[in-house]
Amino acid sequence: MGMLKNGIPSEATLCRMEQGIDDVSMAKKMSEFIALFRQELNTSGKQDIISIDGKAMRGTMQSNGRNPDIVSAYSGQTGLILATVACSEKSNEIKAGSVLLGELDIAGDIITADAMSMQKDIIDKIREKGADFVIELKANQRSLRYGIEDRIGRCKPLQEYTEGPELSHGRIETRTYKVYDGEALIVDKEKWGGRLTVVEVISETINKSTGVRSTERRFFVSSLPPNARR
């Protein structure tokens, strides 16, 4: 078609060209393009659920011998990865999550994340940008988690509903959700910049092949009101 008048570039030429690309600038431009594309897809203006998650990149290695960790923001409504940040250490995921949130337009959306994101600076960033959050609570916030466990038995849930049973991955699972006003459960409420809702999830699982039953109890903290639509 006359596009490559001097022939196909050699492998070495292509490698030199790729090595000359500023990967940070390229990632920034890609994020800008995806933000515009997301606006085009979301013409209805519906609330999006954005998941922040970190994954180790297998099959590649840094100079320190570790697999790099990539923290990404995924849009549940459009199916797009909105932005990514690479971390040299697992512990840097907290900082990377805050950087991601600073780059994204999340006003009116809901941010979901694992327990590592239950940090004051991340919560403040989400509230500051006009979004809500649902974040899992584990022992990394020990006083908060154990305080809720101590008090929750004396509180009545404002909402309670059950999903299942469902068969998945060889297990039959039934989940019960209990929604509480965090006012009575959280001691250091001022630290988190506003009202919080606590969600208790009780998963009862039966292994289909062995019949073994197990129960798991998890907690989530949210800025959404207790009566928010499911």
List the predicted regions and their residue ranges.
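Active-site- or DNA-interface-adjacent structural scaffold in DNA-acting proteins
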Residues: 4-63
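Short acidic, glycine/serine/threonine-rich loops at helix termini
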Residues: 61-64, 121-125, 145-149
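Short, conserved catalytic/metal-binding motifs centered on acidic residues
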Residues: 10, 50-55, 73, 79, ...
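An anionic, glycine-rich sequence signature occurring as long contiguous blocks
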Residues: 138-230
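Domain-level cores of phosphate- or acyl-group-handling catalytic modules
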Residues: 94, 98-138
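Electropositive, glycine- and tryptophan-enriched low-complexity nucleic-acid-binding patches
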Residues: 63-108
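Active-site-proximal loop/turn and secondary-structure-junction residues that shape catalytic pockets
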Residues: 56-58, 117, 139-141
